Regions:
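Active-/binding-site microenvironments in catalytic and ligand-binding cores
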Residues: 1-160
């Protein structure tokens, strides 16, 4: 779980101005972790997550092969099927720096960060809404993808 140094007092967090579809947002975390593990790339450079369909952009040296695309989809679904708990904890920026990548953290982010962990598969600073267990996500389906100028755009959805 989280280190014992978790800030247990009521943390001051940045506000969250978007409403996400929880299954898709949790699936995005699994997709990001899968991409990092398979390709050694950073988490998505930008993401648009909705109930109907979502997209993520990844900086890659080459376009993934059809076999790799199928492997990404299969791996995300394999992790979903493990019925992993999604847990939330709070760490200071200093504590979080040894646990998660803070490179995309806005400069004005709170001193206390909300950390979302999906089993042992993914840990990430996040202020968004999530499912309580991966069993609530459904099936992850890649709709389409394109590659241009080193950016691989992946369009996907979750199906209940």
């Amino acid at each position: 779980m989280f280190p014992e140094e978790i800030a247990m007092e009521a943390p001051v967090l940045n506000s969250h101005n978007k409403s996400e579809y929880e299954p898709a947002h949790s699936a995005e975390h699994l997709l990001n972790a899968t991409m990092v593990k398979m390709f050694g790339c950073p988490r998505s450079r930008n993401a648009h997550v909705e109930k109907k369909k979502s997209k993520c952009d990844y900086i890659l040296d080459a376009e993934p092969t059809p076999e790799q695309v199928a492997e990404i989809e299969a791996k995300v679904n394999e992790v979903i099927s493990q019925n992993l708990d999604v847990t939330i904890g709070f760490l200071t920026r200093e504590q979080a720096a040894s646990v998660v990548d803070l490179s995309k953290l806005p400069e004005d982010a709170s001193e206390t960060l909300r950390i979302v962990r999906i089993g042992e598969y993914d840990t990430c600073a996040c202020i968004g809404a999530h499912v309580k267990n991966t069993s609530e996500i459904g099936t992850f389906k890649i709709i389409s993808h394109s590659f241009e100028n080193g950016v691989w755009r992946l369009r996907w959805k979750t199906i209940k």
